[in-house]
Amino acid sequence: MGRFIFVSFGLLVVFLSLSGTGADCPSDWSSYDLYCYRVFQEKKNWEDAEKFCRQQHTDSHLVSFDSSEEADFVASKTFPVLNYDLVWIGLGSVWNACKLQWSDGTELKYNAWSAESECITSKSIDNQWFTRSCSQTYPFVCKFQA
């Protein structure tokens, strides 16, 4: 009887230690703070990478960051796989929200912007962000809530 209680208690401890640690993530995904993450080495443009992420799991998207700790966690997963490569993150079309004006204060009436949209990459070693044409291809990281 004592051995049964000991084994039952041990199983309960194991179960409780796994719950809330991302145990709900699929086996090929990594967990951090109730989210699941996966690095994909295949290079895609930003739009195709986002579509691919959405196909992987319900509510999955290109990775977003809520803190530097989360970004560091993602870097710890991307760097061993990709070394110094850039990866797509879920930030895109940031310039659409900017209100630009000339340095002399006059309104922007004429522009010669490239038709290329700009999206954001993150450097896998140090989390520095860079704008790149959304049509370029890079590896990417997907994220969903566990």
Swiss-Prot record:
Annotated Gene Ontology cellular component terms: extracellular region
Alphabetic keyword roster: Disulfide bond, Hemostasis impairing toxin, Secreted, Signal, Toxin
InterPro entries: C-type_lectin-like, C-type_lectin-like/link_sf, C-type_lectin/snaclec_domain, CTDL_fold
SMART domains linked to this entry: CLECT
Tissue localization of expression: Expressed by the venom gland.
GO molecular function: toxin activity
TM spans (from-to): none
C-type lectin domain sequence ranges: 32-143
Localization per record: Secreted
Disulfide bonds: C25-C36, C53-C142, C119-C134
Quaternary organization: Heteromultimer; disulfide-linked.
Family classification: Belongs to the snaclec family.
Stated name of the protein: Snaclec stejaggregin-B subunit beta-1
Annotated source species: Trimeresurus stejnegeri (Chinese green tree viper)
